[in-house]
A protein has these predicted regions:
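Structural beta-alpha unit
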Residues: 1, 83-123, 144
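Small/aliphatic-rich secondary-structure junction motif
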Residues: 1-63
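Glycine-rich, Arg-bearing micro-motifs that act as flexible, cationic patches
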Residues: 2-3, 106, 123-148
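A structural signal for isolated positions on well-ordered beta-strands in alpha/beta enzyme cores
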Residues: 7, 34-36, 96, 123, ...
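Short, solvent-exposed amphipathic alpha-helices that sit
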Residues: 22, 73-85, 111
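Solvent-exposed polar/charged
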Residues: 28, 117, 148-151
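A short acidic, glycine-rich active-site loop
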Residues: 59-76
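Short, flexible loop segments at boundaries between secondary-structure elements
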Residues: 144-159
Length: 159
């Protein structure tokens, strides 16, 4: 039987918790399911992207600290997601986790789909109300954008 690999987009929302519980219910105790957790990281503030002259070293240090703080917070979200899936019955070996760096918010859904393809995921799973910060940036629903752009990939939107 063919393995099924799900890319689950996670954040700190209640929608993500419901999504993870649903995925655990569907995928637990099934040898042919693998789950790839993807946490979308927002891009650094613009003032950290542009380096100028003498400020260059100071801005690099500031950017490293910002990335470190963001990654620690996001790692906690991935750890919580992993815990929900494990409690739901998935084996540790069936779960992997990745960051998805969203350099340009207008291409965020494309970046998520690119990660799904690179990790060889058949399906992308997202909560209806997940990634609210991204919805504000793209002036729309990230789940709907994934459905619209996800040609060739199955998209599950969990209410």
């Amino acid at each position: 039987m063919k393995n099924t690999k799900l890319l689950v987009v996670v954040d700190e929302s209640r929608a993500t918790k419901r999504t993870l519980e649903y995925v655990a219910q569907v995928a637990s105790r099934r040898q042919d399911f693998r789950v790839c957790l993807a946490h979308a990281l927002p891009s650094p503030p613009p003032e950290q992207v542009e380096f100028r002259g003498a400020e260059k070293a100071r801005l690099r240090a500031y950017k490293r600290r910002w990335i470190s703080v963001v990654e620690m917070a996001e790692q906690r979200a991935l750890d919580r997601a992993n815990t929900i899936l494990r409690r739901g019955g998935l084996a540790a070996g069936a779960i992997e986790a990745h960051y998805c760096y969203l350099v340009d918010a207008t291409r965020a859904t494309q970046e998520i789909l690119r990660l799904a393809r690179s990790r060889k995921c058949d399906t992308v799973v997202i909560g209806r109300k997940s990634l609210s910060w991204l919805g504000e940036l793209i002036h729309g629903d990230p789940a709907e954008e994934l459905v619209r752009q996800g040609k060739g990939i199955t998209i599950w939107v969990v209410e």
